[in-house]
Amino acid sequence: MKVGVEAIRELRQITGAGLGDCKEALETCSGDMEKAKVYLREKGLSKAYKKSHRDAADGLVAVRVEGDKGAILKLGSETDFVARNEKFRSLAAELVSSLLKHGAEDLSSFSASPYDGGSGVSVADEVVNAAAVLGEHVVLSGIGFLELGGPGVIGSYIHGAVGEGIGRAGALVALEATTAKTEALLEFARQLAMHIVAAKPESVSVETLSNDLVEREREIVAKQVEALGKPESVASKIVDGRMQKFFEDMVLLEQTFIMDGSTKIRDLLHNKGQDLGCEVRIVAYRLFSVG
């Protein structure tokens, strides 16, 4: 099967594999992008097992925290020109404020809720109206809402800020802690949110990581190791070692804290708990980025 140059380039951008390898993968998989990714992984030519948090060509991420609640959303645009437009920024800010107020946890219910900007229409209709004014496609492509169920804090971080709480990437993280809301705990939550933006974990713990994702990765790793021709006892240890590295990349608690490059997040939580005299636990997080 003949595949297009654009598809080859897209696969290369996603996987980091060579152009020739990407062409071979797409031809072998009849142009199926997802199957081609797996093909390259099995050949040991790609490490692209993380899902993308960027499904819009451009746009902005907006985040807002008030007390024990936090909201985050991704507003997509076709170009950077529109993303820098003041009306687009204002829309993102107004939408995230509305999300914080309504506390919606899924995109469809929030889109159907009343827009709080005074226009008397739904959130979805306001986005359509904005697109007409701005002259290109605008899409509300993701939302996140966190609310504490007990003592703790919610931290946030925006990367590439273009305004207060608005930028190119952002994260919310909810921490459970029985101590009072100290500046130290709030700063710790902010640092964790910063880490999440940089490290892009897929789950809080190994237990909450998708079973399908884990099994698919184990199958891919097993095929890679099988090609080495090692004895079964040795191959099994190699598979376990590679899976541990997989977890260290994908799981927040297993990741190494970006700000010191040595401490695992789970150990960081333990250390902070000792400093504060209480247990500190990550309840949940939300992450979005564009561009």
From Swiss-Prot:
InterPro entries: EF-Ts_dimer_sf, Transl_elong_EFTs/EF1B, Transl_elong_EFTs/EF1B_dimer, Transl_elong_Ts_CS, UBA-like_sf. This is Elongation factor Ts. Its main location: cytoplasm. GO terms for cellular component: cytoplasm. Associates with the EF-Tu.GDP complex and induces the exchange of GDP to GTP. It remains bound to the aminoacyl-tRNA.EF-Tu.GTP complex up to the GTP hydrolysis stage on the ribosome. Belongs to the EF-Ts family. GO terms for molecular function: translation elongation factor activity. Gene3D superfamilies: 1.10.286.20, DNA helicase RuvA subunit, C-terminal domain (1.10.8.10), Elongation factor Ts, dimerisation domain (3.30.479.20). Keywords: Cytoplasm, Elongation factor, Protein biosynthesis. The keyword Calcium does not apply. Residues 79-82 are annotated as: Involved in Mg(2+) ion dislocation from EF-Tu. The keyword Protein biosynthesis applies. It is found in: Cytoplasm. It comes from Anaplasma marginale (strain St. Maries). It comes from the Bacteria.
